[in-house]
């Protein structure tokens, strides 16, 4: 590194986006310097006010080293009315396999949910990222809103399907339907990288148990909660007016269908919306410290893989009186689930 300019030819110099060090560049590589990096984010994010120049910074980092390390700075950024995007890379407790408890983030969305100016999204597919970034830039530049978007993105390779029709509004509001069925007896909510496990669990429910599940992709539990809370507040203060319903309540209006929600974060993330979901609601999450393991073993350890989702769905239906309770024990045996395995939060 040389502060007056790059003195060598990088190995990727033939590529369009090759590594380069220049004084007037647009990419700052701050290294392991969280305080300096977030300060650069704040400087760029307040440029619209301090210098009259709209700059929309994208601060990209290991998601564990964002709110966990610099939440005080992020809070200060909100106080200074900064604008921009925080991108937590390698996010989720089970997607970053092999790096142990220091790196596996399962709780940054709790911190984001508690920060008033943060709009937090846990994204599963590339089209969701495109929609959210476009909407965020529209809010910050065109509508001049003082908001910061927090996006968690993962490092796991899987097939990205085409965007369903009319999904854009739901992606922004926090939830959209990804698979329909004529008469669902169960509702599955998935988030981020665990959408793949939810889809596979739905296939097992259909093939092994003749249970049809409607599937929803949740892009933001916190945005769903905030809108539902605002609707409830308005209804509280306007009892003489027509009562409002949130996006969540409009879409999930069948009281007879139990819901199982799954995310790669602690249960409290998906439990945010429990008071506003009609019918029984059960959350699966990754409570506990991370571990150095494969994705498959991590998801089984934290009880969020397809087999635990199936078991949770069967239990939800059994408790609702829709199927026999003996089906639960059948599922435990069929999928070789150890009833005596340690609880993940105690290990």
Spans of features found by a protein language model:
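Generic long, charged, amphipathic alpha-helical segments
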Residues: 41, 174-182, 186-187, 202, ...
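Thiamine diphosphate
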Residues: 1-161, 167-171, 217, 222, ...
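Short conserved micro-motifs at the rims of enzyme active sites and ligand-binding pockets
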Residues: 97-100, 162-164, 227, 271-274, ...
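Hydrophobic alpha-helical bundle architecture
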Residues: 47, 243-256
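Hydrophobic, well-ordered secondary-structure elements that form the walls
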Residues: 41, 112, 125, 188, ...
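Peripheral docking tails and interdomain loops at the edges
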Residues: 12-18, 119, 126-127, 254-347
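Short hydrophobic beta-strand segments
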Residues: 57-58, 152, 184-191, 260-261
């Amino acid at each position: 590194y040389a502060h007056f300019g790059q003195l060598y030819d990088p190995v990727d110099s033939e590529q369009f986006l090759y590594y380069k060090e220049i004084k007037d560049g647009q990419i700052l590589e701050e290294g392991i310097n969280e305080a300096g990096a977030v300060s650069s984010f704040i400087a760029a994010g307040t440029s619209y006010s301090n210098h009259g120049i709209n700059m929309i910074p994208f601060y990209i980092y290991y998601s564990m080293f964002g709110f966990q390390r610099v939440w005080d700075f992020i809070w200060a950024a909100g106080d200074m009315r900064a604008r921009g995007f925080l991108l937590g890379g390698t996010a989720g407790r089970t997607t970053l396999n092999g790096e142990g408890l220091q790196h596996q983030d399962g709780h940054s969305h709790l911190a984001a949910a508690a920060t008033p100016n943060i709009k937090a999204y846990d994204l599963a597919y590339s089209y969701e990222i495109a929609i959210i970034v476009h909407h965020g830039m529209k809010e910050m530049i065109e509508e001049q809103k003082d908001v910061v978007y927090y996006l968690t993105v993962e490092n796991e390779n899987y097939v990205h399907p085409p965007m369903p029709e009319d999904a854009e509004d739901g992606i922004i509001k926090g939830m959209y339907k990804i698979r329909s069925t004529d008469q669902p007896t169960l509702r599955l909510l998935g988030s981020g990288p665990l959408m793949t496990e939810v889809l596979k669990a739905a296939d097992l429910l259909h093939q092994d148990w003749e249970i049809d599940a409607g599937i929803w992709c949740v892009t933001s539990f916190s945005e769903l909660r905030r809108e539902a809370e605002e609707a409830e507040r308005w209804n509280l203060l306007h009892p003489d007016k027509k009562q409002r319903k949130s996006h969540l309540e409009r879409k999930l209006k069948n009281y007879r269908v139990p819901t199982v929600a799954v995310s790669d974060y602690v249960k409290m993330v998906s439990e945010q919306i429990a008071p506003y979901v009609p019918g029984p609601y059960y959350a699966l999450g990754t409570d506990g410290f991370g571990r150095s393991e494969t994705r498959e073993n991590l998801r089984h350890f934290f009880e969020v893989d397809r087999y635990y989702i199936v078991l949770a769905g069967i239990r939800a239906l059994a408790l609702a009186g829709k199927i026999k309770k003996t089906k639960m024990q059948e599922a435990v045996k069929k999928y070789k689930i150890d009833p005596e395995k340690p609880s993940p939060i105690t290990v």
